[in-house]
Amino acid sequence: MSHFKIVFLTSLSLALVFELFNTISVPITSHLFISEYNGYKFGVFGWCKVDGSICSPIRMGYSLDDILLFNDNEYLHLPNHAKYALSKLLLVHVLSFVCVLVFWLFAILICIKWLNTSKSVLLFAVGWSMVTFMVSLLGFLIDVLMFASHVTWSSWLMLVSAFFVALSGILLCLMIRDLSYRRFVKLQGEVDVCVPMTEPRDPDELNEIWKKKTSKREIL
């Protein structure tokens, strides 16, 4: 069981770190970005020029007005202009990070109080792992939808994060099964019930058998 816990927590910790890489992308940090295209780096909360000289304000979604404020001769280009409105869907990255963080906190609580954790809490954690997996996978699909072949390794980490979340959910199901067996063995040890292998006979019948055996011994 200790090996299951180690792999369980390690998988979720890696998923949390990978989600963090996408969440703190440009313009929060200059080295992490989900796409690079036409001299610009794009992140969840905005964009920056490759040289870092100009960055957009930190907000959800991209806008042509950001560039026009700095230089009327430059325009912000995405792979497809129709995708400016879709840039607000990058909020899914933040939602995915929050979901993984909650799942990670659940994992720590479950591993610390393993034998005393109620079954309803464990089942809720399994359900939450499914939600977290779908949100993480959705974040990766949104990156591909917006930036196509221009996605960077940071976006691919979202797919890896979804894999680790799915692995953690499977391990949690195996741990619940093992916990149910441990509780059954513990309950069986506390309640010692003797079950007869055959149906007990009538007392009068047993007395007759005893008399016959004693009479045979007297004859001998």
From Swiss-Prot:
Pfam families: SUR7. The keyword Transmembrane helix applies. Its main location: membrane. The chain crosses the membrane at residues 6-26, 90-110, 122-142, 156-176. Residues 27-89, 143-155 are extracellular. Residues 1-5, 111-121, 177-220 are cytoplasmic. Belongs to the palI/RIM9 family. Required for the proteolytic cleavage of the transcription factor RIM101 in response to alkaline ambient pH. This is pH-response regulator palI/RIM9 homolog 1. It comes from Kluyveromyces lactis (strain ATCC 8585 / CBS 2359 / DSM 70799 / NBRC 1267 / NRRL Y-1140 / WM37).
